[in-house]
């Protein structure tokens, strides 16, 4: 598979996962609030980077600064933007560079926190001049403009992120898989172009599939399954390598067309992915099953006046086969044909990403139904 970058987010507010020999308190049990004491040694980092390099994969280590740094502040007794904090971060970056000798870039974060004047500029200068590496930051920053004095590449993480001229930008704004439905959002990834373009260029470097395991789950396997990790990564990689995508997800959304070119292209991707699920990935935890053969009828939304228990004609109908339209309060309510195992009536990012309903609103009730074939009479759970 043509996946050529592993972005390793090594620090967060809950835990610090990178061994810093000069500051062992960062990885002490008492200073982590999730999975205390679990971290990667520098030897493990070197080993993983070498393993990745043999397979054509570049590792991008990230030490997020100065935000997402609760563990740092707790362990060190001072914040990252203090004089002591800046000195400590430079020592930490020295160790990061030694643990990742092949990494052309070091990611220094910068997001979701108010930046002091000169902080990112000083850290960027240090990485460039003292470590000989290039710098990646998140985009946007909270209170500063991203510019060449702060980064050599940016990673767009929200809808307000815009590409910065004269440097490469990674677009992962709508590729946060921890928000995703297993089925509908895979369609969105595959249908969408990357940053409104058919092909990459000097300013659009590609995309990254980001699995933020902010919510604690029972096992690491659950992270892979619940993020539909394999399918999402391979859909992202294919779109990044071959380009295309009829339109951006901000226009096309996650709705799978019932027929046509986009449907045929996705069906072909699905066929190839399910082949790998059955063969080269047969031992991996993959929840995805074929969805291009799943069809629904979905009603126009009925106004419920804020009462979600209110009953409408589809529930009152006793026919074996439901009709394709209903009369309620002297008004005609039609149904629409839909394809796919997951249908967003309103997307989690509904103000930006279109869904099945063009204008979803509060206090509405809609009905969706499909038919399930069973080769024998049996009872199943729902």
Describe each region flagged by the PLM.
Residues 1-130:
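Substrate-binding cleft of carbohydrate-active enzyme catalytic domains
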